[in-house]
Regions:
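Membrane-interface transmembrane-helix boundary segments in multi-pass integral membrane proteins
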Residues: 92, 234, 240, 269-277, ...
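N-terminal membrane topogenic signal
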Residues: 37-56
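Cytoplasmic-side transmembrane-helix entry/capping segments in multi-pass membrane proteins
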Residues: 119-128, 148-153, 170-179
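Membrane-interface loop-to-helix entry segments
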Residues: 94-99, 144-149, 232-254, 315-322
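Membrane-interface helix caps and helix-loop-helix hairpins in membrane proteins
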Residues: 138-148, 164-169, 188-192, 235-238
Length: 356
């Protein structure tokens, strides 16, 4: 019995030592995970014709620096980049354009394995796309619309990658290059969006406050005030929710392409940005009216200031994003569950086949 116990103990000890020996390489592999810089180096070294791309890209960048802008009235420079900087810095609705190139590069890093595996070759038909990009810029240069030239600039970069690395690269990099669209300033074109957004937000806010909450208000177009005119708020273009719509649309586009593969699901996620952004702006406007009504009732004469505080507060200005992000994640959860339910019958049937 003692001999059997000793033998069992020895076998258990040997098994433990073997497990430790087997786990050491795994730990070494975990510790040897490549760094971000190493992964970037791997991506760059895996791309052919790098010298050709750098030469074409450098020429493209220099061209738009010296012949990119013809509207010298706003900022006295021919550089498209200086005009972009001026536009981004003077419009809060367009300042997202500063970080769009970084977002695109970051998502290219995220897709590095896919980009490395696609077949690459020099594809001369992409010269048609490059010519088309130059044509877009020429139109913008002639009509003095620098934002049109920005479209040509970004589309040209996308076309140059197709010229150097082929059509499969263009297909694989369509997203995130699609996000370059958010680097184009909206400018005066925003009026076609801000006006209907202002009216929609005003109508919904007026109905919620007046009908659901029973607040004695008067709505006249985009202006909402209480019946005694103690506080008045106008939903102007700056309060239409355009900024939150742009940010929400950009985030939803990223989320749609990253989390889903089916086109209709991606489209559903992206399109949901419009109603959810409006819902977020309505929440903010409703809180402004509520704050004004509560303080006006408690301290007469303080209602307008209370509403202005909610409007101007930096933290409270983030409120429109809360229902938007919660809504899209719920929608994404529903779509994900739909995917899982579709796979369950397949698993069951495969199990039956195995049993047979």
């Amino acid at each position: 019995m003692g001999l059997g116990f000793a033998r069992g103990f020895a076998l258990a000890r040997l098994s433990y030592i073997q497990q430790l020996a087997m786990s050491e390489p795994e730990k070494k592999n975990e510790d040897a995970q490549p760094s971000v810089m190493e992964e970037i180096s791997r991506l760059w070294s895996g791309l052919p014709n790098k010298s050709l791309f750098l030469a074409l890209f450098g020429t493209w960048v220099v061209f738009f620096h010296f012949l990119g802008n013809s509207t010298l009235g706003y900022v006295d420079t021919h550089s498209l980049y200086a005009w972009m900087n001026w536009t981004y810095s003077t419009s809060k609705d367009d300042e997202l354009g500063y970080i769009i190139p970084l977002i695109v590069l970051g998502l290219c890093y995220w897709k590095r394995d896919e980009l490395l595996t696609v077949p690459k070759r020099t594809w001369w038909p992409a010269l048609v796309l490059v010519t088309f990009a130059l044509g877009i810029h020429l139109v913008g240069y002639v009509i003095q619309q620098a934002r049109v030239s920005i479209v040509g600039f970004y589309f040209g970069i996308y076309a140059l990658t197709g010229l150097v690395w082929g059509p499969n690269w263009l297909k694989a990099s369509f997203f995130p290059c699609l996000l370059f669209a958010f680097g184009v300033p909206v400018g005066t074109m925003a009026e076609t969006v801000t006006v209907p957004l202002s009216h929609i937000a005003s109508d919904i806010t007026g109905w919620i406050c007046g009908t659901l909450l029973g607040i004695d208000i008067i709505q006249e177009g985009v202006q909402i005030s209480d019946s005694q005119s103690r506080y008045t708020y106008a939903i102007a273009a700056a309060c239409s929710g355009l900024r939150s719509l742009i940010v929400t649309l950009a985030f939803f586009t990223i989320y749609g392409f990253v989390a889903f593969t089916k086109k209709w699901k991606i489209a559903m996620i992206i399109l949901s940005a419009f109603p959810l952004a409006v819902a977020g702006n309505v929440l903010r406007l409703t809180l402004i009216i509520l704050a004004a009504e509560m303080f006006e009732t408690a301290k007469p004469g303080e209602g307008q200031a209370a509403g202005n505080f909610v409007h101007d507060n930096g933290i409270l200005s983030l409120l429109p994003y809360i229902p938007a992000f919660i809504g899209v994640f719920i929608l994404g959860r529903i779509i994900k569950e739909d995917d899982q339910s579709e796979t369950k019958p397949d698993l069951t049937s495969s199990g039956k086949e195995d049993d047979e």
